[in-house]
Amino acid sequence: DVQTGLNMIICPELAVYSITHDRDKVLRDLADMAMSRSKNEFTRTTVLEGTLLPWRDTKVPESLQKVVDWCVEQGAYQAFNDVTVGHFGFKPETDVLYSSRRKQNFNLPECRDLVRVEFSKDSQKAFGAKPSAGARSQYMVLSKFAQYDCIVHFHCPMKPGANVAVRPQRMFECGSHQCGENTAAGMMEYG
């Protein structure tokens, strides 16, 4: 900010890092993040013709609908330039995930329709639209924890006193294989 001298890094997944008036520090942090993230691996998504799965379709688990709807009601998905940060989906079979779509405002019901994504080791094919950047990470987490079939992710401040593990994320871009591995490694039971 040229008026206040405040600097910050806003990364592609809209997380904010290094909020400071020390320009040299924020530039060092930015260079460090860029070097770390440049080593991340990604699987390119091929988008093919197809039809989206409507949010209220009976194939969409009722539990996923209820949780996402509740999160929306609680303000979990904050819009910035009419796009919300986060993603959600479900895994109905071994190599298939239905994921939320990229660059949507999940506060609008029509933006919650899901895209079918088929995975193999070296490719992922989406049908009808581009899936969330986090689709590969969703798939990796649900593959590691096969007892679960749904996943919901959003950015929000921690509740004071919350006993929830936090994984460092700044070196992993959302959608990278390393992001999925980092997230899966930090998963644990609560409650």
What are these regions (language model features)?
Residues D1-G191:
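Glycine-rich flexible loops
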